[in-house]
Amino acid sequence: MTWRIDYSRDSLEFINKHKLQNKVREELRKFLVVINRGQAPINLKKLEGKWTGYYRLRKGKIRIIFYINKLEKALYIERVDFRGNVYK
């Protein structure tokens, strides 16, 4: 079974505005390959506080905030933004 990736409207707007479709897609693909092997990616962080239950991936100055639904094999991309703005 393959993984499904759903994007919030805000994350899609940021990705399209900055022409980051390929970068984000590639980073998520790498993440899925690593977790399918049972390993933990180095650039992954489990978030706390307001973002409890979400994870963060780093790609340069860009942060990808997402939720993992392992039962449905789905990623929900909540936010994609630059480091200083993503948590606001």
Describe the role of every protein-language-model region.
Residues T2-R9, R25, K59-I62, Y67-K88:
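Enriched for short, Lys/Arg-rich terminal
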Residues K19, K23, N36-Q39, W51, ...:
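Short coil/turn residues that cap or connect secondary-structure elements
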